[in-house]
């Protein structure tokens, strides 16, 4: 039997298991025209937490850069941060589409993902591939407005975004690939005409902080699918450390808080940063870890959304207050 015939048979069997009437997973998607619905799903328009998680590294990096810069940053600070956030949104969206293309046959075997557009046949491979390429190109259009070195940073981030789905297939550590979103720190510094290597240790500590928070969030999500991931042959740190996930999650809370303290200490931050930024991060993520420990499969997205949003807000507020306090 040819590969094409086998693929067609798998697609047919997948469709046979689908409900006759498809209901969009959120009100946001239900408002889209029917022809746009699968593309909205590919972009994860119904998963706003993902947009928060990809934008916050650039917002945090901007506040951090302003705090450690030897002089007041240029007047176009906010326009450049906006361009970086728009880049991150399109990077995330294109990455989600690419992930669905690479994982469609695995997604068909997992209850939470079997109704995604590709497994249910709502879009073809070629349509999804063109859509992913167009989405990435839109992101690069924003990067083109930044200093030239940012294009190199963007290509590095794109490489890891494309690599991610294969990390799930060939290892139990795809979250380490996701952690490379920490590259937002040097990219933002380049975008603001700062040299990351002039502040190597604070920059590395902040990179580690962003990476550890991203890894922790994804492990919390992956915990929902451990049984099905094992059956489907999908690797993750949640699968690898399934018997000590609570300990790992709490360790990541403490490790990320320690990285933030190191970044603040070496960046000459003051009391407002350690009280508001570090305290807010530690408090909210400790709450999230405890909530996940009590019930890892119920209300995870609700708790994660509120904790991440609140912790990010306090992190940035602490940096801004600290900057004003020291000026």
Swiss-Prot record:
<dbReference type="GO" id="GO:0008412">
    <property type="term" value="F:4-hydroxybenzoate polyprenyltransferase activity"/>
</dbReference>
<keyword id="KW-0812">Transmembrane</keyword>
<feature type="transmembrane region" description="Helical">
    <location>
        <begin position="201"/>
        <end position="221"/>
    </location>
</feature>
<feature type="transmembrane region" description="Helical">
    <location>
        <begin position="307"/>
        <end position="327"/>
    </location>
</feature>
<feature type="transmembrane region" description="Helical">
    <location>
        <begin position="271"/>
        <end position="291"/>
    </location>
</feature>
<comment type="similarity">
    <text>Belongs to the UbiA prenyltransferase family.</text>
</comment>
<feature type="transmembrane region" description="Helical">
    <location>
        <begin position="174"/>
        <end position="194"/>
    </location>
</feature>
<keyword id="KW-0472">Membrane</keyword>
<feature type="transmembrane region" description="Helical">
    <location>
        <begin position="49"/>
        <end position="69"/>
    </location>
</feature>
<keyword id="KW-1133">Transmembrane helix</keyword>
<keyword id="KW-0460">Magnesium</keyword>
<dbReference type="InterPro" id="IPR000537">
    <property type="entry name" value="UbiA_prenyltransferase"/>
</dbReference>
<comment type="function">
    <text>Polyprenyl transferase; part of the gene cluster that mediates the biosynthesis of anditomin, a fungal meroterpenoid. The first step of the pathway is the synthesis of 3,5-dimethylorsellinic acid (DMOA) by the polyketide synthase andM. DMOA is then converted to the phthalide compound 5,7-dihydroxy-4,6-dimethylphthalide (DHDMP) by the cytochrome P450 monooxygenase andK, which is further prenylated by the prenyltransferase andD to yield farnesyl-DHDMP. Further epoxidation by the FAD-dependent monooxygenase andE leads to epoxyfarnesyl-DHDMP.</text>
</comment>
<feature type="transmembrane region" description="Helical">
    <location>
        <begin position="244"/>
        <end position="264"/>
    </location>
</feature>
<protein>
    <recommendedName>
        <fullName>Polyprenyl transferase andD</fullName>
        <ecNumber>2.5.1.-</ecNumber>
    </recommendedName>
</protein>
<dbReference type="InterPro" id="IPR039653">
    <property type="entry name" value="Prenyltransferase"/>
</dbReference>
<dbReference type="Pfam" id="PF01040">
    <property type="entry name" value="UbiA"/>
</dbReference>
<dbReference type="GO" id="GO:0006744">
    <property type="term" value="P:ubiquinone biosynthetic process"/>
</dbReference>
<comment type="pathway">
    <text>Secondary metabolite biosynthesis; terpenoid biosynthesis.</text>
</comment>
<dbReference type="InterPro" id="IPR044878">
    <property type="entry name" value="UbiA_sf"/>
</dbReference>
<feature type="transmembrane region" description="Helical">
    <location>
        <begin position="140"/>
        <end position="160"/>
    </location>
</feature>
<dbReference type="GO" id="GO:0016114">
    <property type="term" value="P:terpenoid biosynthetic process"/>
</dbReference>
<keyword id="KW-0808">Transferase</keyword>
<dbReference type="GO" id="GO:0005743">
    <property type="term" value="C:mitochondrial inner membrane"/>
</dbReference>
<feature type="transmembrane region" description="Helical">
    <location>
        <begin position="81"/>
        <end position="101"/>
    </location>
</feature>
């Amino acid at each position: 039997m040819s590969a094409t015939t086998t693929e067609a048979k798998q697609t047919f069997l997948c469709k046979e298991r689908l409900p006759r009437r498809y209901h969009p997973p959120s009100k946001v998607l239900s408002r889209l025209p029917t022809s746009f619905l699968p593309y909205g799903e590919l972009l994860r328009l119904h998963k706003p937490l993902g947009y928060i998680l990809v934008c916050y590294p650039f917002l945090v990096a901007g506040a951090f850069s302003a705090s450690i810069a030897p002089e007041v940053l240029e007047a176009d600070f906010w326009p450049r941060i906006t361009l970086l956030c728009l880049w991150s949104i399109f990077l995330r969206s294109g990455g989600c589409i690419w992930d669905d293309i690479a994982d469609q046959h695995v997604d068909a075997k997992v209850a939470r993902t079997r109704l995604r557009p590709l497994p249910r046949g709502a879009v073809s491979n070629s349509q999804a591939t063109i859509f992913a390429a167009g989405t990435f190109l839109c992101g690069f259009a924003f990067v083109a407005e930044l200093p030239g070195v940012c294009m190199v940073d963007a290509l590095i981030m794109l490489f890891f975004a494309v690599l991610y789905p294969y990390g799930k297939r060939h290892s139990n550590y795809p979250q380490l690939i996701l952690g490379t979103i920490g590259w937002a720190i040097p990219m933002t510094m380049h975008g603001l005409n700062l040299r990351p290597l002039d502040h190597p240790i604070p920059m590395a500590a902040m990179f580690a902080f962003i990476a550890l928070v991203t890894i922790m969030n994804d492990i919390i999500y992956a915990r929902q699918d451990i049984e099905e991931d094992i059956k489907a042959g999908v690797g993750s740190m949640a699968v690898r450390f399934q018997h000590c996930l609570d300990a790992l999650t709490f360790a990541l809370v403490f490790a990320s808080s320690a990285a933030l303290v190191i970044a603040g200490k070496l960046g000459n931050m003051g009391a407002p940063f350690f009280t508001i930024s570090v305290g807010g991060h530690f408090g909210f993520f400790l709450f999230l870890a405890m909530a996940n420990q009590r019930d890892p499969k119920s209300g995870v997205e609700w708790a994660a959304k509120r904790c991440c949003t609140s912790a990010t807000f306090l992190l940035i507020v602490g940096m801004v207050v600290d900057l004003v306090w020291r000026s």
